[in-house]
Amino acid sequence: LILTALVFVHFLQALKFNGFLSIIGVAIFLTSRITVLAAATPLIDSIYFLNVMVVIFLILTNRFNLFFLFMPLTLISKETLLPFLFLVVFKEEFWANKKNIAKFIAALVCAFVVFILSRKFIQVDGEKAKGIGQLILALLPNIPEVLRAIMSPQGIFNIFNGMFLTYLLSLYAYFVNKMDHLPRFLKFYVFIPLVFMLIGGGVHMGRHLFIIFPVAISCALITIEHFFKAASST
């Protein structure tokens, strides 16, 4: 989690946030309920957060060769990292070099090979984990029930999970400022955790949604920055 926080600092600075706002952003991440739980218990979420953070940082800073080298390692922790890898195609700089397409495909194949081998040789205790496809198929007939669960008081509590103020500030940036401060690929990023939240359902909705933190906290900082500028101009 410390490594994730360090990468997050550089990520926020790459988005042109000043040092003060970057520190606030990292503090929000480190003090969130999900992060505290991940630090207190041996959950794989810690590695998951780090991998997602590294992926989007490398894409943001156009370090595509490092991104391709890192791709085979990502799926070892969680197969749900796969959709995040495709965010690179929404980066305009990715298409500037045609070789990037071939490199991306090769890295993707290597990632799948590493994933298959890791699942073959690494035994998981307890009930066998379901794949994304199985979870989606299980979700489809239960969509009304999932939506009712989300709208219930317990569902709302599970979703926010101590991040209510951050999500509220980020929504202001999304609807008022249109997230103009953020590159296009991060605007597509937000849909992945939302889908995972619907698929996961139950008490884990907040955990699945929390992976939105790089964009949610960035948008919250945009709102804070906007309020600071408005206050200083009055």
Predicted feature residues:
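Hydrophobic, aromatic-rich transmembrane alpha-helices
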Residues: 5, 160-183, 187-194, 219
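Transmembrane-helix signature of polytopic, lipid-linked glycan biosynthesis machinery
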Residues: 32-37, 118, 190-205, 227
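Specific aromatic-rich, kink-prone transmembrane helix
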Residues: 46-66, 215-219
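Short helix- or helix-capping micro-motifs
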Residues: 22-31, 71, 75
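Membrane-interface alpha helices of multi-pass inner-membrane proteins
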Residues: 53-58, 65-90
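Membrane-embedded glycan-lipid processing machinery
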Residues: 28, 34-47, 200-212
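Transmembrane-helix motifs of polytopic, lipid-linked glycan transferases
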Residues: 1-15
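Perimembrane helix-loop-helix junctions
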Residues: 83-109
